[in-house]
């Protein structure tokens, strides 16, 4: 079990992590931007450290600032919460390189699961049930139409690289599939 963790996030998720850590008797370090200095998560944590200006790209997404904060406060692990750096394999790797545990999936798992086509293939290989769909990348609208005819409508059309729900379209009927495919492919 960790003695101290740094929460690389803000707001409600940071508050929840702090409360859970407190129940486990784990000390917490909150990070904050200059805009969030008096935010609730900074007040609830055992320690709080500024990681940069209000702009998220210069604070909550600044890997070097967050790792420096963890080293300075002697945190043993970093909990990313969700969003920000939570799915950043480079961040997870850098945590490992400086001897700080990343609380979440490994960088390798993030890389595998970040590509939807590869993720689906890995799930099938591991015998995890998956919903009917393509067996790989769909290159043309005609190929998408053939797959949709086989499995039936409605279908969900997903851009393989889209994350967080981006690039996903529900298609109710064949006549809408071509335009949805073109949108997802652009």
Question: What is each PLM-predicted segment?
Answer:
Residues 1-186:
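N-terminal beta-alpha lobe that positions the nucleotide/phosphoryl donor
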């Amino acid at each position: 079990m960790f003695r101290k963790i740094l929460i690389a996030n803000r707001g409600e998720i940071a508050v929840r992590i702090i409360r859970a850590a407190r129940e486990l008797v784990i000390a917490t370090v909150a990070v904050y931007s200059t805009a969030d200095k008096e935010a609730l998560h900074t007040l609830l944590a055992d320690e709080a450290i500024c990681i940069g200006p209000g702009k998220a790209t210069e604070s909550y997404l600044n890997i070097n600032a967050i790792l420096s904060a963890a080293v300075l406060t002697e945190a043993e692990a970093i909990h990313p919460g969700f969003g920000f750096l939570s799915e950043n394999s480079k961040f997870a790797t850098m945590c490992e390189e400086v001897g700080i545990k990343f609380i979440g999936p490994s960088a390798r798992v993030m890389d595998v699961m970040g590509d939807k086509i590869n993720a689906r293939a890995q799930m099938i290989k591991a015998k995890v049930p998956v919903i009917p769909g393509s067996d790989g990348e769909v290159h043309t609208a005609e190929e998408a139409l053939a797959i949709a005819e086989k499995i039936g409508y409605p279908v969900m059309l997903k851009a393989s690289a889209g994350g967080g729900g981006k690039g996903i379209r529900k298609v109710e009927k064949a006549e809408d599939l071509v335009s949805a495919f073109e949108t997802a492919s652009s």
